[in-house]
Regions:
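Active-site-proximal alpha-helix that buttresses catalytic centers in soluble enzyme cores
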Residues: 2-70, 94
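Generic beta-sheet signal
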Residues: 7, 48, 134-143
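Short, active-site-adjacent cap segments at secondary-structure transitions
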Residues: 16, 57-59, 77, 144-147
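Phosphate-handling substructures
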Residues: 28, 65-123, 184
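Generic structural signal for well-ordered alpha-helical scaffold segments
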Residues: 38-42, 121, 125-133
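Short beta-strand scaffold positions
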Residues: 52-53, 122, 139-140
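Domain-level recognition of soluble alpha/beta enzyme cores
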Residues: 156-181
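Short, solvent-exposed aromatic-acidic interface loops
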Residues: 182-188
């Protein structure tokens, strides 16, 4: 009997702070948009497993959606190391050469003290491949969702970085054994 899975990938609610800031693990989610949360909740399957990033913003979003989640560090955002908690403007002002070098190859380059997007994909790979069959809701980050898309759609890391993943957006992926397909919201 083939193994079927549906992944329901949700990006956490918006985070406060200055525009362009790279939030830390303890940044709060703004879960005040009750209408958006309700629209999203109505699209989710009733029976499911649910997992979130350990970041506060992902856990707060899961609670606001009424999900009982376990937390898995593999679903955490890309580690931006020394750049976490700072705006892009501050980072560039502090070290323009390092910042510019990072953006020449953002998929493979590492921020100082952090991890590359390629390394994030490797981190996500193990947990995605081990997910149970059935519906699995994952509340995570734009980078985590892009990493999952890279794996499922067999995209290069550079191409996966082209996806825009908005706060409170839903990305759906289906898997039959090891074959993936993509979808947007709704039910299958």
């Amino acid at each position: 009997m083939p193994q079927q899975s549906q992944l329901w990938l949700i990006r956490h609610a918006p985070v406060g702070g200055p525009p362009g800031m790279i939030p830390g693990i303890d940044a709060h989610a703004d879960v005040s948009d009750a209408a958006a949360l309700l629209r999203l909740r109505e699209q989710l399957p009733a029976r499911h497993a649910a997992i979130s990033s350990p970041a506060r913003r992902a856990r707060e979003t899961a609670v606001a959606l009424g999900l009982l989640v376990s937390s898995d560090p593999a679903f955490g955002e890309q580690d931006f190391g020394d750049w976490t908690g700072r705006t892009h403007e501050e980072i560039r002002r502090g070290s323009e050469a390092v910042y510019d070098e990072f953006w020449r190859a953002p998929a493979s380059n590492r921020p100082p003290g952090g991890e590359s997007f390629v390394e994030q994909i490797a981190r996500v790979r193990g947990v995605i491949e081990a997910l149970p069959s059935g519906d699995v809701i994952i509340v995570a980050h734009a980078g985590t969702i892009r990493a999952t898309l890279a794996l499922a759609l067999e995209l290069s890391p550079e191409r996966a970085l082209r996806f825009a993943i908005d706060p409170l957006s839903l990305t759906r992926l289906g898997r039959l054994d090891n074959a993936w397909r993509s979808g947007r919201g709704g039910s299958s």
